[in-house]
Amino acid sequence: MARKARLKAGDAIFHIMCKSITEVDLFRDCADKNKYLSLLKKYKIIYNVKIYGYCLMDNHAHLLIYANGADISKVMHGINFSYAMYFNKKYKRHGPLFKDRFKSLIVDNDNYLRTVSLYIHNNPTDIGEFKDCPEEYAFSSLGIYIGKRKDAFGVVDYDFVMSLFGNNLKKARQSYCSCILGCTDEKWKEEIEFEDETTDYKSERKILLRNFKSDDIIQFIASKMGISKILLHMKHNRKLVKSRALVVVLMRSLCNFKSSDICSILGNITQARTSKLCTIGVDLIISEKKYENIIGEFIENYS
């Protein structure tokens, strides 16, 4: 029987659930969960999506993601494929890790968004020691939402969801905590089912179109790095690695290009090298302050 095509609306918010195969825990230790969070950060940068919330349990993960013009299937493939490669190498295993495709539903109104966010953050109450204090669970974004913990990986964009609980952040956090403690898991399960749904829900979000020109990206990076744009097509020059890496990240993020497309544009480069440059570029954006808003700067200049 053919699989049902997944709805991939670029302007949608998705509640995503990833589950491991029956006999294997998705996360065996804290290091595994930290690795998954680092991959969320990486692919958030590459695809310019917004992650509204997450909760990583031992055998499954819940994510709340605004696609912002990206193809959600590509986003999740990047995250889960990279994690499966890491997991299989670490534990010297072969074969699939995830159970089928990820499950997803489209969040089609503000009330439903509130409910889904609360449902995700309520998951740790299934663990005995966190039954009455889910905010203490380190691998849920709840602690970040209510100001109890800093976002160590810089993953979560909680402002939009919190605005649905009030304009004053302090009061919104109090309201959020009250909702978490006052609602039963059974009630949420009645409202949340993983089915693809059509929607025209847009709220006040602006979608990022992925139709920027590669020539503009090359010119922008060349100007920012103080080099000739011709040099960005040169393969063997270690001094240009940072520049080429940033070009690759921006093309992946803003042009909806595949690795093969970027290979053709830069010339004389393999897909494996393109992937490596992308990783280098993401690391630069995360680790060096002067590059942390480089994607935003480009969008501001060329929109």
Language-model region placement:
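Conserved G/P- and acidic residue-centered "switch" motifs that form tight phosphate/ATP-binding loops
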Residues: H62
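Short Pro-Cys-Gly-centered "Cys-loop" motif that presents a nucleophilic cysteine in a tight turn
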Residues: M1-G53, M57-D58, Y66-S303
